[in-house]
From Swiss-Prot:
Keywords: 4Fe-4S, Cytoplasm, Iron, Iron-sulfur, Metal-binding, S-adenosyl-L-methionine, Transferase
HAMAP family: Lipoyl_synth (MF_00206)
Annotated [4Fe-4S] cluster 2 binding sites: 94, 98, 101
Gene designation per UniProt: lipA
Protein name (record): Lipoyl synthase
Pathway per the UniProt entry: Protein modification; protein lipoylation via endogenous pathway; protein N(6)-(lipoyl)lysine from octanoyl-[acyl-carrier-protein]: step 2/2
Subcellular location: Cytoplasm
EC code: 2.8.1.8
Length: 321
């Protein structure tokens, strides 16, 4: 039996190093096996990158992270150029090692006590009116990092009284009650937790997560905060069927979720799960119609849609693709 890999605290493990730590092995995709991107997946980069550099500089100044950068989001240039960003708290090292995600895995450092104040000041300096806060998974913390979310919500509102806050939270596995108690007095304006894929694919796509647990987290939060909208998102192109996606949508509605995002999965590298299929825009349109028929009040469905992509517009019910 081989010895387990000893991870150093604070070291980021990515790509092949990260995948080597996953119990279910994912063989690197050969270049000839990679699906060619269709025309609708081509991104036009903005001509002016100054706004992008300004936002990156603001992040570096206060030692903050954006999921846009850490997860290699394809919409980074567009969102940064429009002056929006999704902040990632609790460091940039995740205790999980999902094979679809480009965020680094490892043993994270202790949470930075001053991060909530730094985050609030950065948001104030950027003059944001709507902000999305997410985090890595922190299975090493008693509350999964929930109190840190609550502290960030409190500090952001203290300095930015008119802002709207959306939190994209992890599943708080094994500590849901403690986490929800921590969020009780400082909830967000929108509570987002992604199911990511159909339950059949969880062992491959979300090792360490549980489909029913995630649904229960969404249900319990909504029960405690009936006036706060709950939201969830799914990736397409990982081998799921349309019928499976529709069943997930029904499960979400049965658990009180009213906001939805559906987007195309893109493999960050050949070491990650490969794209099984590029879903055409017409199919996203069809799923949006189904979602609205099921009772979702907001449904952003399209190849480039991500949880926080134009989240301010999503919250207003405007069409996002």
């Amino acid at each position: 039996m081989s010895k387990p890999i000893q991870m150093e605290r604070g070291v980021k493990y990515r790509d092949a190093d990260k995948m080597a730590l996953i119990p279910i092995k994912n063989m690197p995709t050969e270049q000839k096996e990679v699906l060619r991107k269709p025309e609708w997946m081509k991104i036009k980069l903005p001509a002016d990158s100054q706004r992008i550099q300004d936002i990156k500089a603001a992040m570096r100044k206060n030692n903050l992270h954006s999921v846009c950068e850490e997860a290699s989001c394809p919409n980074l240039a567009e969102c940064f150029n429009h002056g929006t960003a999704t902040f990632m708290i609790l460091g940039a090292i995740c205790t999980r090692r999902c094979p679809f995600c480009d965020v680094a895995h490892g043993r994270p450092n202790a949470p930075e006590a001053e991060e909530p104040k730094k985050l609030a000041q950065t948001i104030h300096d950027m003059k944001l009116k709507y902000v999305v806060i997410t985090s890595v998974d922190r299975d090493d913390l008693r509350d999964g990092g929930a109190q840190h979310f609550a502290d960030c919500n409190r500090e952001i509102r203290a300095l930015n009284p008119h802002i709207k806050i959306e939190t994209l939270v992890p599943d708080f596995r094994g500590r849901m009650e403690v986490a929800l108690e921590a969020l009780k007095d400082n909830p967000p304006d929108v509570f987002n937790h992604n199911l990511e894929t159909a339950p059949r694919l969880y062992r491959k796509v979300r090792p360490g997560a549980n489909y029913k647990w995630s649904l229960e987290l969404l249900r319990q939060f909504k029960e405690q905060h009936p006036h706060v909208p709950t939201k969830s998102g799914l990736m397409m192109g990982l081998g799921e069927t349309k019928e499976e996606i529709v069943e997930v949508l029904k499960d979400l509605r049965a658990h009180g979720v009213t906001m939805l995002t559906l987007g195309q999965y893109l493999a960050p590298s050949r070491h990650h799960l490969p794209v099984e299929r590029y879903v055409p825009p017409a199919e996203f349109d069809e799923l949006k119609e189904i979602a609205l028929e099921l009772g979702f009040t907001h449904a952003a469905c399209g190849p480039f849609v991500r949880s926080s992509y134009h989240a301010d517009l999503q919250a207003k019910g405007l069409e996002v693709k």
